[in-house]
Amino acid sequence: QDIANSGWNYTSSSSYITLSFWVKSSVSQDFKGYIRTVDGTSQVYPYSTGTLSANTWTKVTKTIPGNSNLQFDNNNNTGFQLYLWPYIGTSYTDAGVTENAWTAYASGTRTPVSATTWWTTNDATFEITGVQLEVGSHSTDFEFRSYGQELALCQRYFCKMKAYAGASNGWIIQYPVTMRAAPSATVNSGTIGSVNQITTSTSNWNLSGGSANMAECFYSAEL
């Protein structure tokens, strides 16, 4: 998810993102989590689910403000990490940690002290679904998509094709869907002879030249 260009004015305390998810535990407990930013001076935002009723699906919604210390570089590296722990142990917690507020990240002060009920209960279960992160101060219903819809959206960024061969002509290889941008093409296995030209667009990949065979090729248009 592109945080830097999402529309969230993340350095302003009056601009928000909203995290929502459904969670169920076989034991009643308050579970801890945190958000961590990576770029610049790392920041942490601890939160909790509140005490869950055993074996009951509960929707958790967290509205998170921006902060002047946040930084998200405009690249494809990791910049935003989201955690929710059934049990985080004792090495990363501290009784003095304040929830629902940004502060400088430190390994030993990620969340307040976590209850041990779930951890010490044999065969305890923990389930989570419908995780959604949105710009704004309100959550919306989770958007369910069919497998075909989700696959087509993913293929805008990456696809893989196999088994093409030729003599001394050329290929025009059509992608399954129009890609986000002209991708980079990488031949993973096979051989290419005297190549005259390789061109890519958002809709196809064109190779012209001498004899060639391709067992597998990756096309990537990642952010």
Where are the regions that the model predicts?
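Extracellular and organelle-lumenal recognition/adhesion modules and their flexible linkers in secreted
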Residues: Q1-L223
